[in-house]
């Protein structure tokens, strides 16, 4: 077993914010106090200029590296983050927070509503990607970080980092949106609606009050996960891994058990997911993604969202990603070009589908490495291990 040096050991913490004044949400409602759970890795340099914010995807959380507290599995981006890796914890100070509305420590529908002493459930206000980013900005205030070196995220994380560039352009030097888009498509909203309806149709959902009723809508949440997981893959990857191979049997059973390996795989994904994720959080976070549209506040003209920005961008897409296809990333790049923004674009050739950003994909890793090294050199960040603080 490889033991990480002390500076690269993850620190898992939480902080209560907005104690004196609530945070105003995009809906017009207010929320506070709110708790943000987060992980940090590495050391913040004396100038506080080497911080990277990693934004997680829909079903992710703050545990980028290290054993997950619920599943015991490795962190979701250990392929990329660590000493000497692409996102080098000897050089950068890494922050990742559980998003607002999440279910691993940050205020969300699973947590206790201080006004009632019971879980929020559907009493929790509907949130947006903008609200998630607003909470992250408050966390950075708490950590004493005025400006990020870089914000990086895939899928829903890409939405967050783009929102960072639009809402707080003066607080981030570089942004890397991976396998994302500037708005959620009709097809993706449709897939989310199928998942939400599966959850809400489960009798154990109890109108969203299942935690107070002592039930969990496991079946509905599992189906939602199974449906969504298909969109994270690709037909070539499914064909290569499963094809029409049978699951532990010599012939079909003429029944409705999992005859095919792909059926068994999806059932396994659903069963594992319900052990670590909250059903109401799934409703709220998918809705936040559906509402995401960077052009909405700019008369439908995306380029205006990036007008005058000094942020340096690297936009990454994958050839086999049909959830957020390359055309979506190209639209973002064209808008940035129209706004005279500093942007690089790379389409990575892979058959691994949308989830390629989570996997061992050398071309993607090399792309990210090159961009980070170039940006770090431009902004004067030193290479190698240095002493610093762990706020």
Swiss-Prot record:
Residues annotated for substrate binding in this entry: 225, 355
Active-site residues, record numbering mapped to chain: 155 (nucleophile), 321, 354
EC number from the UniProt entry: 2.3.1.31
Reaction catalysed by this enzyme: L-homoserine + acetyl-CoA = O-acetyl-L-homoserine + CoA
Function statement: Transfers an acetyl group from acetyl-CoA to L-homoserine, forming acetyl-L-homoserine.
BP-aspect Gene Ontology terms: homoserine metabolic process; methionine biosynthetic process
Subunit-structure text: Homodimer.
Species in which this protein is naturally found: Rhodospirillum rubrum (strain ATCC 11170 / ATH 1.1.1 / DSM 467 / LMG 4362 / NCIMB 8255 / S1)
Enzyme superclass (EC): transferase
Domain AB hydrolase-1: 50-360
Any one GO MF annotation of this record: homoserine O-acetyltransferase activity
SUPFAM superfamilies in the record: alpha/beta-Hydrolases
Subcellular location: Cytoplasm
Superkingdom, taxonomy of origin: Bacteria
Biochemical pathway: Amino-acid biosynthesis; L-methionine biosynthesis via de novo pathway; O-acetyl-L-homoserine from L-homoserine: step 1/1
Family stated for the protein in its record: Belongs to the AB hydrolase superfamily. MetX family.
GO annotation, cellular component aspect: cytoplasm
Protein name: Homoserine O-acetyltransferase
């Amino acid at each position: 077993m490889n033991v990480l040096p002390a500076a690269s050991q993850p620190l898992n913490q939480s902080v209560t914010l907005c104690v004196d004044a609530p945070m105003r949400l995009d809906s017009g409602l207010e929320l506070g106090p709110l708790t943000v759970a987060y992980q940090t890795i590495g050391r913040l340099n004396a100038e506080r200029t080497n911080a990277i914010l990693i934004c997680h995807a829909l079903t992710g959380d703050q545990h980028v590296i290290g054993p997950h507290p619920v599943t015991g599995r490795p962190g979701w981006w250990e392929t990329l983050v660590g000493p000497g890796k692409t996102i080098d914890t000897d050089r950068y100070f890494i922050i990742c927070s559980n998003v607002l509305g999440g279910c691993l420590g940050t205020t969300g529908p699973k947590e206790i509503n201080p006004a009632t002493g019971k879980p929020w459930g559907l009493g929790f206000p509907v949130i947006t990607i903008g609200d998630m980013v607003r909470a992250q900005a408050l966390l950075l205030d708490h950590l004493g970080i005025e400006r990020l070196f870089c914000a990086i995220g895939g899928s829903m994380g890409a939405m967050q980092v783009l929102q960072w560039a639009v809402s707080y352009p003066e607080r981030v030097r570089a942004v890397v949106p991976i396998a994302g888009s500037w708005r959620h498509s009709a097809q993706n909203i449709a897939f989310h609606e199928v998942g939400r309806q599966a959850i809400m149709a489960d009798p154990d959902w109890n109108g969203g009050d299942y935690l107070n009723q002592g039930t969990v809508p496991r079946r509905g949440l599992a189906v939602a996960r199974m449906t969504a997981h298909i969109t994270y893959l690709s037909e070539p990857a499914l064909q290569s891994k499963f094809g029409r191979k049978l699951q532990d049997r010599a012939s079909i059973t003429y029944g409705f058990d999992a005859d095919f390996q792909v059926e068994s795989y999806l059932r396994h994904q659903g069963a594992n997911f319900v052990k670590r994720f909250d059903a109401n959080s799934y409703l709220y976070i998918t809705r936040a993604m559906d509402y995401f549209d960077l052009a909405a506040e700019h008369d439908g003209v995306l380029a205006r969202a990036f007008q005058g920005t000094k942020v340096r961008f690297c936009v990454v897409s994958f050839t086999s990603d049909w959830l957020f296809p390359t055309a979506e990333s190209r639209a973002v790049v064209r808008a940035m070009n129209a706004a005279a923004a500093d942007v690089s674009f790379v389409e990575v050739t892979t058959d691994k589908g949308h989830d390629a950003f989570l996997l061992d994909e050398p071309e993607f890793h090399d792309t990210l490495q090159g961009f980070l090294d170039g940006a770090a050199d431009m902004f004067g960040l030193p290479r190698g291990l240095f002493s610093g603080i762990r706020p």
